């Protein structure tokens, strides 16, 4: 039995080192941002989003979930964001620690997911690591992780990374019908932050490079190759359009207001 375990460990280390790279990215990112778990709320929307938010302050409840999906709060319709705060309070109690902890964990997970998505797309192990590490450890990421209000960034980022991974899998031969999962993950991400409206455009860019699904978009017969790639994303474009309109309405800027 021990021999089998040794062989398995040796295979993972020698044959699939990317597992260890993803784990290392997670661990180092967690260590770098761990001090944020000791921070307090700050007077930049934290109190407005959590202690003073009646949807969130009581913890998780089905009534709160219903309210999250039916209420525009402070010009935002972000039900997944409010539900995530409810879950924090339910698991860790009142106070900022749980919110900070979940932010840090989400960011560390996102670092590993980004590496894995890049590696699956390119096969370039160390370049994928470098890009993921730059994303995870850049000082500009501190605001999104250490500021509880910016949960929307790391939470939508998690759905974004998962959507990328599922899409890469869907693009591999033999053809896999996983676009429904991409749609679902994009929907959840948009309910945390509306910036995910760019996802279908990004997927088209990935079709060109590095996935190489459509070939040269300017070459002979290119539309015949690209038409099905655009068509499969029509539901995603429609979803983006819906959330763009919804965001304009909730911010009071639609219809000339």
Predicted regions, residues:
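Polytopic membrane enzymes that build or remodel cell-surface glycoconjugates and lipids
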Residues: 1-257
């Amino acid at each position: 039995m021990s021999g089998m375990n040794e062989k398995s460990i040796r295979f993972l280390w020698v044959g699939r080192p990317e597992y260890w790279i993803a784990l290392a990215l997670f661990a180092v990112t967690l260590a770098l941002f761990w001090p944020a778990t000791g921070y307090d709320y700050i007077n930049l929307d934290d109190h407005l989003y959590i202690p003073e938010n009646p949807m969130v302050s009581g913890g998780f409840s089905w009534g709160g979930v219903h309210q999250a999906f039916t209420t525009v709060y402070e010009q935002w319709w972000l039900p997944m964001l409010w539900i995530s705060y409810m879950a924090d309070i339910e698991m860790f109690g009142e106070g900022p620690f749980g919110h900070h902890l979940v932010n840090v964990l989400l960011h560390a997970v996102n670092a590993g997911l980004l590496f894995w998505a890049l590696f699956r797309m390119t096969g370039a192990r160390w370049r994928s690591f470098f890009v993921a590490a730059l994303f995870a450890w850049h000082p500009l990421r501190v605001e999104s992780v250490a500021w509880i209000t910016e949960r929307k960034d790391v939470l939508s980022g998690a759905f974004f990374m998962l959507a990328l991974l599922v899409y890469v899998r869907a693009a591999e031969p033999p053809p896999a019908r996983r676009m429904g999962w991409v749609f679902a993950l994009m929907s959840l991400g948009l309910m945390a932050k509306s910036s995910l409206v760019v996802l279908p455009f990004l997927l088209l860019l990935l079709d060109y490079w590095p996935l190489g699904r459509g070939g040269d978009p300017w070459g002979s017969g290119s539309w015949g190759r690209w038409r099905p790639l655009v068509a499969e994303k029509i539901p995603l474009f429609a979803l983006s359009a819906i959330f763009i309109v919804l965001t304009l309405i909730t911010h009071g800027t639609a219809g000339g207001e």
